[in-house]
Design a protein with these regions (language model features):
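Alpha-helical transmembrane segments and their helix-start/interface "positive-inside/aromatic belt" motifs
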Residues: 3-11, 81-101, 204-214, 269
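Alpha-helical membrane-interface segments at transmembrane helix boundaries
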Residues: 45-53, 85-89, 176, 205-208, ...
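Hydrophobic transmembrane alpha-helix segments characteristic of membrane transport
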Residues: 59-95, 187-201
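Short amphipathic alpha-helical coupling elements at transmembrane boundaries
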Residues: 24-27, 83-90, 110, 117, ...
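Binding/recognition "hotspot" determinant
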Residues: 1-59
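Alpha-helical transmembrane segments
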Residues: 192-209, 241, 272-276
Length: 279
């Protein structure tokens, strides 16, 4: 039950916000872009992808011609059957990549989702551990007189604010990953069309690499949450004989430090992946 003490309530509310954001992250990472927010964003992105496909196909021809001009010294090179066949195969593959780009991206997404679910199940918890206020801390706070509790109010206000801000920063990173996935999906045909020409194909390659990096960010975020849950599963050790303010300050300090570690890891997930994949 909720305590009727304002200080305890404030701390418990902040922790509740944190816990709800953590479980929301857990939920978001197992959600596919088609299910996110009822799928309305996804359907718009698919429509945009379809419209951009026309531009992609026009660019495909352009990159193909540029590629032919750049790679063939003269027209006689193009007339060689093996050279012509190579060019034709490249064009056909590039056309296929644009037409079935969405399916390709979803297949990659499914592979990474599988990895994320495997990480979750092998870690052995379906949801991250809840952070709660220790009972002895509640007792200490509730036994304070009016004047003793004035500095406590200040401490909990600062602590509560910190915890709330950290939980929002963390959830924003996860939403940011989703929005990146949508943007990649919508604009995919343009970078994919560069596969038509040999000089321009690096753009397409780096597009696919960056897309995989965005997908794998999810796995890093899950790992960060798992490590945090295990790291913070033992509540901060507080000296029960110390003054109430000191106890609360020590508790909040250690808690916020643990949370900062997690938020830092979540925010750096894209950098970690880029370093891992050498992007």
């Amino acid at each position: 039950q909720m305590s009727d003490n304002w200080v305890v309530q404030n701390l418990e509310n902040a922790l509740e916000t944190w816990n709800s954001k953590l479980s929301e992250i857990w939920q978001l990472l197992t959600t596919s872009p088609q299910q996110f927010k009822g799928g309305s964003i996804w359907s718009v992105m698919v429509n945009i992808n379809g419209a951009v496909q026309a531009i992609g196909l026009a660019l495909l021809v352009l990159f193909f011609v540029v590629g032919v001009v750049r790679t063939c010294g003269s027209f006689t090179d193009v007339k060689k059957p093996e050279h012509a066949l190579k060019l034709f195969i490249r064009f056909a593959i590039a056309k296929g990549v644009i037409t079935y780009g969405l399916e390709l991206m979803l297949a990659l997404f499914d592979i990474v989702q599988g990895t994320i679910s495997t990480i979750m199940t092998s870690a052995g918890f379906g949801t991250p551990n809840q952070t709660t206020l220790p009972a002895e801390m509640v007792t200490t706070i509730e036994s304070c007189g009016f004047f003793e509790s004035i500095p406590l109010w200040a401490v909990t206000l600062i602590g509560g604010l910190f915890i709330t801000v950290l939980s929002f920063i963390m959830i924003m990173t996860v939403y940011g990953r989703f929005f990146k996935l949508y943007m990649y999906t919508a604009l995919a045909p343009i970078p994919l069309s560069t596969f038509a020409g040999e000089p321009s194909q690096n753009v397409g390659k780096s597009f696919i690499k960056s897309y995989c990096a965005v997908l794998l960010e999810g796995a890093v975020i899950v790992l960060a949450c798992i490590i945090f849950s295990l790291f913070a599963s033992t509540p901060p050790v507080v000296n029960p004989d110390a003054a109430a303010v000191t106890q609360v300050w020590a508790y909040i300090g250690e808690l916020v430090f643990n949370m900062l570690v997690l938020v830092g890891a979540v925010k750096m997930s894209d950098r970690i992946i880029r370093e891992m994949m050498g992007l």
